[in-house]
Amino acid sequence: IFKKMYDNGDIYKGAYKGMYCTPCESFWTESQLVDGKCPDCGREVHYAEEEAYFFRLSKYAKPVQELLESGEFLEPASRVNEMINNFIKPGLEDLCVSRTSFKWGIPVDFDPGHVVYVWVDALFNYCTAMGYLNDRYDDFDKYWPAVHHIVGKEIVRFHSIIWPAMLMSMGLPLPNKVYGHGWLVIDGGKMSKSKGNVVDPYKLADMFGVDALRFFLLRTFPFGSD
């Protein structure tokens, strides 16, 4: 997949300089930081620089914008507004899609000093797990495109901007719809396993039953809101 996008001119080699969030494995520009911290997780960032391959995300800015503005691809509307105002209108920057600072991961076959960054291999897992470009399974044509992607709001950008652009690059059909849901919060902050502030759903299910818990969650929380 990486080689195909490279061969069609959508991946090129360059150098990345920017503010890096280690837990999120994401680079950010100064303008994207919130109070000098990662806009996704709120943790500290640090300056980093490395040779890398980039995906020409900027090339797909117009078709992605048209996709979002259609009102048919992403819900709720508040997420559409966030994507357009926070990312599309300021201008999409080309996306860093390889790393040299660690060795674990899928190596770039034509440049083994680089490993493929998680947002390429993780997103395309939707396709490769069903047999796309491999002979382990043969379900891709049966099940793709996906009917729905249901994702947390912190990864809406990856599923509604980056993912469609990469699928366009590969000439593959897009998912029919992406839904970006809000967070469950406690004491004003996001519930997070890494922060250790999660209410154990298994205990609630044991106490009240699985169906009662599902009904409570669906009935109580407006979709898309925290």
Language model segments and positions:
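N-terminal Rossmann-like or analogous alpha/beta NTP/dinucleotide-binding catalytic cores
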Residues: 1-11, 25
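The −1 position to Zn-ligating cysteines in a subset of zinc-ribbon hairpins
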Residues: 4, 20, 37, 95
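Short, glycine/charge-rich beta-strand/loop segments that flank catalytic centers
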Residues: 14-27, 180
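Short metal-coordination and nucleic-acid-contact micro-motifs, chiefly zinc-binding Cys/His arrays
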Residues: 17, 34-35
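Structured secondary-structure scaffolds
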Residues: 23, 41, 47-226
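Cys/His-rich microdomains that often coordinate metals
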Residues: 28, 45
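Short linker/helix segments within small regulatory modules
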Residues: 29-34, 110
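Predominantly a Rossmann-like dinucleotide-binding segment in NAD(P)-dependent oxidoreductases
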Residues: 35-36, 50
